[in-house]
A protein has these predicted regions:
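A short glycine-rich, Lys/Arg-flanked "PGG" loop and its adjoining helix->strand segment in the class I
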Residues: 86-97
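Conserved beta-strand signature within the Rossmann-like core of class I S-adenosyl-L-methionine
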Residues: 98-105
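A short SAM/SAH-binding and catalytic strip from SAM-dependent methyltransferases
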Residues: 71-83
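Class I SAM-dependent methyltransferase SAM/SAH-binding core
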Residues: 16-62
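Core SAM-dependent methyltransferase catalytic element
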Residues: 139, 145-158
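A short acidic, Gly/Pro-enriched loop at the edge of an enzyme's catalytic core
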Residues: 61-72
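Short alpha-helix
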Residues: 122-137
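Conserved class I S-adenosyl-L-methionine
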Residues: 7-13
């Protein structure tokens, strides 16, 4: 991610903060957004000792951010977002010039996620479609690679 103490970072879909606990101490400002009050509360607990953290319980697409970010990332969250082009375009608009957007998308193409007592609707997409969304938002794809469970994109704002 190329983090340093001067960078501002946004995580879309911060969840319980499992990635944020490693990222937040490495940057100037860390902001995480998630729609789930339960997971935001867990993230608050997990990130309690880190001062430069802001957690937002809200929808990334409708929340009105008051700052721009040097790095925006999202790990396996976009499968929950139906309006992917809108989400990528919003992320691009929140980046500082030269800022990085890192996105991992799940290789699983199921339409639902079984959560035991309920099923959650998913909006899977292909790597090709995701690359198109990123480019249409005015970002340059620097890297694209696959892991066992995901395709990861690293893009940059001009």
């Amino acid at each position: 991610m190329q983090l340093d103490a001067g960078k501002s970072v946004l995580e879309i879909g911060v969840g319980t903060g499992r990635l944020a606990v490693r990222v937040a101490p490495l940057c100037k400002i860390f902001c995480g957004v998630d729609v789930s009050p339960k997971t935001i509360e867990r993230a608050r607990e997990n990130l309690a000792g880190i001062k430069q953290v802001a957690l937002i319980c809200g929808d990334f697409l409708t929340y009105e951010f008051t700052q721009h970010f040097d790095v925006i990332y999202s790990s396996l969250t976009f499968m929950h977002i139906a309006e992917k082009q809108k989400a990528v375009s919003k992320a691009a608009g929140l980046l500082t010039p030269g800022g990085r957007f890192i996105l991992s998308i799940d290789k699983n193409k199921s339409d639902y996620l079984d959560m035991g007592t309920r099923q959650v609707k998913l909006y899977p997409d292909t790597a090709d479609a995701t690359k198109t969304y990123i480019q249409a938002a005015g970002l340059t794809v620097l890297k694209q690679f696959k892991t066992e469970f995901a395709t990861i994109f690293v893009a940059q704002k001009k």
